[in-house]
Amino acid sequence: MTTPGPMEAAAMAGARWPVSVKGVLGWDGRIVVLRNHRGEWELPGGRLESADKSPQDALRREINEEIGLDAEIGPLVDSWIYDVEGKLVLILTYACEAPQPEALSHSDEHTDVRLVTPAELADAPIPSGYLSSVETALAGC
């Protein structure tokens, strides 16, 4: 008998996973990323809340809260499981569009915000699932 992996063990225990929605948003071949308090770069977005009517509404709200932009939420481009310090989170990533601001700002949920190329992301401390999401979104889904 094989030992179950973390997803199988969580499912067998009846665990409920949080869901996080993220957006691939950028201009001129550069993508918006935010540095979280763990020192990782991530895409803008966050967890679904009970008042959200859909994952897209949650993402629209989160992008506005985190970087102050009113984004158009496009198609789902990726889904993956992220193990955040022993807690499994389902990540749903959408392609997004918004008018480019003169400058980017971030909320106190993050320590930095940048526009980076996909090549710059390859060497950054960023979960591999985000890299896959960016690649898929830029390839046109």
Predicted features and spans:
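Conserved hydrophobic "DFG−1" position in protein kinase catalytic cores
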Residues: 25, 33, 96-98, 115
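NUDIX/MutT-family hydrolases
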Residues: 95, 105-137
